[in-house]
From Swiss-Prot:
Domain notes: The N-terminal domain interacts with the head of the 30S subunit; the C-terminal domain interacts with the body and contacts protein S4. The interaction surface between S4 and S5 is involved in control of translational fidelity.
Organism of origin: Methanocaldococcus jannaschii (strain ATCC 43067 / DSM 2661 / JAL-1 / JCM 10045 / NBRC 100440) (Methanococcus jannaschii)
One GO process term, biological-process aspect: translation
UniProt keywords, alphabetically: Ribonucleoprotein, Ribosomal protein, RNA-binding, rRNA-binding
Organism placement in taxonomy: Archaea, Methanobacteriati, Methanobacteriota, Methanomada group, Methanococci
The keyword S-adenosyl-L-methionine is annotated on this UniProt entry: no
GO terms of molecular function: rRNA binding; structural constituent of ribosome
Record carries keyword Oxidoreductase: no
Protein name: Small ribosomal subunit protein uS5
Listed Pfam families: Ribosomal_S5, Ribosomal_S5_C
Length: 217
């Protein structure tokens, strides 16, 4: 369903500022570490966001009244141009579980640092990543490494979905531990992308590596 900002009634200060046009760029929120507590904030500022359901599982737990079953969904959202988020949601039915996961993924949105860090390439365009990143979730870990143009996403399906929606076209990956848990694998990949933002780069190297944070116009 297409988002209509006129029908949105924001519940937070940031939400009201977005609706009133005082905040018009998602980067302002991310640069100032402002909390995104409403998924509609992302809907308003990143209207080209795509959603992909990675996994829906039936999970059961014992309760004093008997066995209770719920659905757990894992979702990734991204605009294929420098922004991505991962989330999970639980509910008694599939639809609400997916909607909860989408909402959480939007609230977890990050800006992705891209570039060309492969010594085999050196084209200076943001088709890959500028240097290696590492992420871990539970017993799952992943290392992402710069790759030359044309290699593609050398990764498992879950990591490929996260990297693709982030706007990365070429990358090598190494995985460690248990990769069969979809949510952990997706979150480990998400954390690896997030880790790229913690490395500072000198200005003279930024141009050489073609580093871009967020969208490429």
């Amino acid at each position: 369903m297409r988002f209509n900002i006129d029908e949105w009634e924001p519940k937070t200060t940031i939400g009201r500022m977005v609706k009133e046009g005082q905040i018009t760029d998602i980067d302002y929120i991310l640069d100032n570490n402002l909390p995104i507590l409403e998924p509609e904030i992302v809907d308003a500022l990143l209207p080209d966001l795509e959603e992909k359901v990675l996994d829906v599982k039936l999970v059961q737990r014992m309760h004093k009244s008997g066995r209770r079953a719920r659905f757990r969904a894992t979702v990734v959202v991204g605009n294929r141009n420098g922004y991505v988020g991962v989330g999970k949601g639980k509910a008694k039915e599939v639809g609400p579980a997916i909607r909860k996961a989408i909402a959480q993924a939007k609230k977890n949105i990050i800006r992705v640092k891209r570039g060309c860090g492969s010594w085999e390439c050196g084209c200076g365009t943001p088709h890959s990543i500028p240097y290696k990143g590492y992420g871990k979730c539970g017993s799952t870990a992943i290392e992402i490494l710069p790759a030359p143009k044309g290699v593609g996403l050398v990764a498992g399906d879950v990591a490929k979905a996260v990297l693709g929606l982030a706007g990365i076209k070429d990358v090598w990956t190494k995985t460690f531990g248990e990769t069969r848990t979809t949510y952990n694998f997706a979150m480990a990949t998400f954390e690896a992308l997030k880790s790229l933002n913690f490395t500072r780069t000198m200005e003279k190297h930024k141009e050489k590596l073609g580093i871009v944070e967020g969208r490429v116009l």
